[in-house]
Amino acid sequence: MAFRWVAEAKRRGAKLIHVDPRFTRTSAMADLYVPLRSGTDIAFLGGLIRYMIENEKYFKDYVVNYTNAATIIRDDFQDTEDLEGVFSGLKEAPQGTNQKYVYDNATWQYKRTAPFDAAKAREEAIKAATFAEMIQKMVPPPAEKDPTLQHPQTVFQIMRRHFSRYTPEMVEQICGTPKELFLRVAEMLAENSGPERTTMFVYAMGWTQHTYGVQNIGAAALLQLLLGNVGRPGGGILALRGHATIQGSTDVPTLHHSIHGYMAHPDARRRHDTLRDYILTETRPTGYWANLPKFMVSYLKSMYGDAAKPENDFGYDWHPKIAGDYSFMASFHAMAKGEIKGAFFFGQNPATSINGGLIRRALANLDWMVVKDNFEIETAAFWYKSPEVESGELKPEQIKTEVFLFPSAQVGEIEGTFTNTQRWIQFHEKAADPPGDCRSDAWFTHQLALRLKKLYADSTLPRDQGFKNLTWDFDYEPGKYPTNTRIQGEPDVMKIWREINGFKTDTGELLKGFGELKDDGSTTCASWIYCGAYPEEGKFLPANRNPDPDDKPGTHLGWAYAWPANRRILYNRASADPNGNPWSERKKLIWWDAGQKKWVGYDVPDFPATKAPDTPAKPGAAGMDAHDGKSPFILLPDGKGWLFVPTGLQDGPLPTHYEPMESPVPNLLYPKWQTNPIAKIYEHERNQLAQVGDPQFPIVLTTYRLTEHHLSGAMSRWLPWLAELQPELFVEISPELAQEKGIQNLDWVRITSKRGSIVAKALVTPRLRPLTVNGKTVHQIGMPWHWGFMGLSTGDVVNDLTSWVADPNVMIHEAKALLVNVEKAK
């Protein structure tokens, strides 16, 4: 659906470049198709960064004024070029982290104009009377800068040295991309960026599913900042999510490490003992995140209602604290060791997920498991129909896991909202009742909570007080329950939205925006970024359906609601020059109106509406007063886009090329450090890794999705039409590799990794081509991962080949580059 807008852009003259290991339908539409070896994106993007710097193709006025290029970094910082592949601060990891190394980022920090003792400031701040006074005491002196960009420790010069060896020749050697194609990409990017033009990067799982996935995206962000393509129409980085409302599931989170609105989850391992400790640890004292106390207190009021009071830290001690790594792989690692007794799986099919064979064996260690889905998926059926049961390794009568399968309503059978990748919250209506016992996730969660509240009602145990005080008032008011349905017991969606949006605690009046939030308990709001979506009774903005007419700019402010504050382009102050004038008339979005003394335009300003461009920063101030009128990036402490990331990333302040955990070749840039030094590896006898250039596993496998299927196939392989469109699992093999292996089209072939072995039909195609990597021929194959052993269309589980290795920032797995062997099946 999204690609129709790409097609429309091409019709209007836009250029489309497609960089991918495989030639796909997107490639066929592209002006330029560029192959590369899977897992080498940072080398490719790093080469583009070097090209823009050395050829002075970067947008200098934007870079100097709107990024931290001019900021000076501490003298003791050392780059990968100084330390042969790692940054300063590398040290051995503590036990239990599933890592060999971690970083101490002290040397990555800005050099300040005066000394600042953060520990001493914290000692004083904790004594302050109010949260605002606490934050004020944590404000550091400003950073040293050199607007000429000549100081050797400026971010610009550090970045220049860091990428100096990412030459077109090095890109060709690492990526296998012909030098001429790479240079054409660089030229096209430069031609389509600057004051008059913008370029957008669009990515999906091809960038994320790596042990350096966050740094892949960081490299693209760095490049876009250099080119002036952030905060402007037609620019930015667009993530194509895996399915509907993935954005919403991180905003109102199903994440283990954050709570609503991207606030950090209270954590027993950090200085989060009290609410004050949490606020001092997590609040950035300058920039908009200085408002964290307002967001957090309002969130706690949404959790505990009248029981949340100033004298009990608004119930902070009742809030659960995480005490370890509860990410996907870590949880199944614990399950494999018998440390988890029960599990819920809503719309999730882990039996076909990463290192699927190990996951299915881990499921057999549970006492009980709840699966809520549309059909009896592989996870629900693992105990009697998995490959391990079929082979006799596991026996159903010996598996103790009791499985509870609850049939789920489908999306057309419920009403609610989706949040898309552009942060638009859109309401959708219900088309029909679900059949039989099928129920929505909201019904299940609501009914479970009501029953648990009854069970805990008489408890006097201190540990249960938080759950007893948890507010749960989502039943319809008497006489208000819908009469056009046979389903009973659904919660009132608009009551849930009241809590998400927020209201004044004493009167119940809905809040019009997050600017009204307070840190004294007078406002209740579950999710500060969604505050304003439901500003008054009868006015639910996600249900708006008023598009711009054709002669308008197309920001569509009357269609749905985009968080925050209905802004359609984040950091849109950057769409105007430092003086507040549009960089370009054809690209103008917001601008400063001196007559009205405010920012005006086609979008809601992502900036203080009345802060003039010539407003100076207030020395020593906290919050937004610390930023001048020329600092668009309001959520960052210095208001500048970060080319160099001093804090927040676990694996370095600049993107650096490392090889995937399994690679056919050594790391040409840094031979001493083959892989990301702080990637997570979950050790298990069934999670072995192939060594560099292992002759038993010489071929690179990348996995992908098909238009006709959805993720593990749980929503598509049961549907006859979709199953007929893509009826069986296949493996794409180049003609050259097929000839070498004696494989014909449609032959059954066996694909084997260090973790597992599967069979599939061969699809011999020139869509994948051999690449020359540092003088060596490297073959790549591709496989879709939608299949499993249940449903109308069945096939082997491709993820049985993958491993439990993860990016250290977000713990995503590496399924886009691994080593396998391919042979004709006997």
Where are the regions a protein language model picked out?
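A glycine-rich phosphate-binding loop feature that marks nucleotide/adenosyl-phosphate handling sites
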Residues: N65-A69, M188-L189, A204-G206, G236-Q247, ...
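Extended redox/cofactor-interaction regions of prokaryotic respiratory oxidoreductases
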Residues: M1-V6, R12-A14, H18, E133-A143, ...
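Glycine/threonine-rich phosphate-binding loop and adjacent beta-strand/alpha-helix elements that clamp
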Residues: T401-P434, A449, W785
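Conserved short loop/turn motifs at secondary-structure junctions
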Residues: M170-T177, Y203-T211, L240-A244, G347-T352
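Long, well-ordered, tryptophan-enriched scaffold segments
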Residues: G13, R22-P195, R284, T445, ...
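Long, contiguous, secondary-structure-rich segments that constitute the structural scaffold
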Residues: W443-E499, G595, V600-P608, A612-H627, ...
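Flexible glycine/proline-enriched surface loops and loop-helix/loop-strand junctions
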Residues: M29-A30, H151-P152, S164-E169, V202-W207, ...
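Short beta-alpha connecting loops at secondary-structure transitions
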Residues: A28-L36, A380-F382, E390-S391, P407, ...
